[in-house]
UniProtKB/Swiss-Prot annotation:
It comes from Prochlorococcus marinus (strain SARG / CCMP1375 / SS120). Keywords: Aminoacyl-tRNA synthetase, ATP-binding, Cytoplasm, Ligase, Nucleotide-binding, Protein biosynthesis. PANTHER family: HISTIDINE--TRNA LIGASE, MITOCHONDRIAL-RELATED, HISTIDYL-TRNA SYNTHETASE. Pfam families: HGTP_anticodon (PF03129), tRNA-synt_His (PF13393). The gene is hisS. It catalyses: tRNA(His) + L-histidine + ATP = L-histidyl-tRNA(His) + AMP + diphosphate + H(+). This is Histidine--tRNA ligase. Coiled coil: none annotated.
């Protein structure tokens, strides 16, 4: 019989790592909620049309990377490759903009059929924030500050904020024709993929990871030279606000966003510690998306953080595992019933309790208590049952006379006091 394994690019999150994820998620939620941002949860499966309309037919995501299939009703469905389009759809479908501007956060798995590599699997996880109905430069700066403060509060080092402006759709239309004319002079350097992008989405070539193309685009025309005065003024205002907030940044005129719905502000937070996959957080403004998906005109801006890349950067700085406060050692029919009752009572008092269910000798159960890193072991056996007692042992204390305590089973207040010390 064939051994069943995960699909390539789909990775199990094991208990030895899940506690780190929980701590990151908890800190993210704290940062978002103190900024008045509320959670939204959307399905991982959507109609394919949502992404083809929202992200753009000409993008690599839609053209090459989506997990799409026809369901039994004949509908084309797709596992979400990103979160923004789904959140925008939910905002439209549920009429949330009728209640005023929306400040929302989301998290969960996304799916793209890419070559798996460190920090990016085919199933990957993002946590992100979206503002709908907010158009000011101040809202751009506020969103950037929320992302920046969250990542710095995690203790990450060597972070750099890069910003750019993509201007208006008219700015990009003028620039697009200039860029195409320039790139058409170098067909032998572009390769098949970039030649295809040249026809569909030439700005994506600026984001190429190919070293030869990166050298080529160093001399390409700049979008910043094709902006109208209003776009220039807006970008200068953003820089002034970021300086006021004392958030360090650099302008990267080659920075583009990979999806079609972006305009004006684009930003990335990168770390040299990640090598080629340097981006930890990416975001920008997308004022036309809601209308493009059938909703009212609604300015919007958002960002997403890649959890896998974030955990690579954090390394071992967050504890990997949650250790029990109490390991309940028990043997014998009456003792097992008493141990289960005590475990429940202690858990209801917010102690982390692991109950041994092996029926093994006490020595083996003590080894297990030590292995899981328990602070205390509580022993209930026939002797303790007959005396109406429980025996407590503080683990990892060398002096045996100081690490064992006998306590009456009925003395719950004293037990709690001891466990809290």
């Amino acid at each position: 019989m064939t051994n069943l394994k995960t699909l390539r690019g789909m990775v199990d999150l094991l208990p030895s790592h899940s506690a780190r994820w929980q701590k990151v998620e908890t800190l993210a939620i704290k940062n978002f909620e103190r900024a008045g941002i509320k959670e939204i949860r959307t399905p991982i499966l959507e109609l394919t049309e949502l992404f083809s309309r929202g992200i753009g037919e000409a993008t690599d995501v839609v053209g090459k990377e989506m997990y799409s299939f026809e369901d039994r009703g004949g509908r084309s469905c797709t596992l979400r490759p990103e979160g923004t389009a789904s959140v925008a759809r939910a905002v439209i479908q549920n009429g949330l903009l009728k209640q005023g501007p929306q400040r929302l956060w989301y998290g969960g798995p996304m799916f793209r059929y890419e070559r798996p590599q460190a920090g990016r699997q085919r199933q990957f996880h993002q946590i992100g924030v979206e503002f709908f109905g907010l158009s000011s430069v101040r809202s751009d700066a506020e969103l950037i500050s929320i992302a920046w403060d969250f990542l710095n509060e995690l203790g990450l080092r060597n972070l750099k904020l890069q910003i750019n402006t993509l201007g208006t759709s008219e700015d990009r239309k003028n620039y697009r024709s200039k860029l195409i004319s320039w790139l058409e002079n170098f067909p032998e350097l572009l390769g098949e993929d970039s030649l295809n992008q040249l026809k569909k989405n030439p700005l994506r070539i600026l984001d190429s990871k190919n070293s030869n193309i990166q050298k080529l685009i160093n001399d390409a025309p700049l979008l910043g030279d094709h902006l109208n005065q209003s776009s220039i003024n807006r970008f200068e205002s953003l820089q002034k606000v970021l300086n006021t907030l004392k958030i360090p940044f650099s302008v990267n005129q080659r920075l583009v966003r990979g999806l079609d719905y972006y305009c004006h502000t684009a930003f990335e937070i990168i770390s040299d510690d990640l090598g080629a996959q340097a981006t930890v957080c990416g975001g920008g403004r997308y004022d036309g998306l809601v209308e493009q998906l059938g909703g009212p005109h609604a300015p919007a801006i958002g960002f997403a953080v890649g959890m896998e890349r974030l955990l690579i950067l954090i390394g071992d700085r967050l504890a990997n595992e949650i250790h029990p406060d109490v390991y309940l050692i028990n043997k014998g029919e009456k003792a097992e019933a008493e141990a289960l009752l005590l475990a429940r009572q202690l858990r209801l008092q917010d102690f982390i309790v692991e109950l041994d269910d092996s029926g093994a000798a006490f020595a083996k159960q003590f080894k297990r208590a030590n292995r899981v890193g328990a602070t205390w072991a509580i022993v209930i056996g026939d002797e303790e049952i007959n005396k109406g007692e429980i025996r407590l042992k503080r683990m990892k204390v060398l002096n045996k006379d100081k690490n064992e305590i006998l306590l009456k089973k009925s003395d719950s207040l004293e037990l709690r006091k001891i466990l809290e010390t």
